[in-house]
Amino acid sequence: MECRNAMGCDYIATGHYAKTSQAADGTWQLHRGEDPKKDQSYFLYSLTQERLAHTIFPLADLDKEHDVRRIAAEQGFINAKKAESEDICFIADGDYAGYIERRCGHAAAPGDIVWRDGNVVGRHSGALRYTIGQRKGLGVAMAHPVYVTGVDAANNTVHLGEAEDLTAAALTANDWIWSAPADRMEAELTSGGIRVGAKYRYRQKDQAATLTRGEDGQMLLTFDEPQRAIAPGQAVVVYRGDIVLGGGTVTGALK
């Protein structure tokens, strides 16, 4: 938006698969894209009312495989048949850890792999190569399936445990941003909480939950059913139907 203002533009158009609508009272709504397999509204929760008013999604009602590629071919675009990226588009080789190391200018430091009882069971070549819920490529051989249950960046340790250790009933989140009108959302929040569909992973189906504010000021999302492998640092986004209400950054999982 700073770039839009600096250039004197009225709107920014982006190729994300999402859509907006304006209510009779002038407020804006951010919706999921028409194609559920391509929907990218999860990544756009930080678009506030002011930002939504100046954002256009030209692909909102188009199907990528048929409409978008056809239009691109008709216009002579050389990338009309280019294979799409399933992951981070600017890391072509998929080596996320290597990308971070190159950006930081040094290799990740090795550290301990710790079992649930506190005993060191192995060594890792960089904690950034592990994610909560990971089962393969751990570098540790045990007689039964084990999973990454935590990554302690401050102490450079990776923690392992059983599948049951990944289960949580709720999560906390900070840096919360409302995409829906903030005053209305805050009013609902203080009147007993907000029933939402929540996603803490991009490809995840909506999980029924209640959103409240905890005593520490963080958002508290309590799920109807136990959840698995909630990872701090991930975005959590809440919906009402196909409308994005807002989101924040996961800070922890609660049993």
Predicted regions and their residues:
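Nucleotide-activated chemistry modules centered on ATP-dependent adenylation/adenylyltransferase
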Residues: 1-244, 249-255
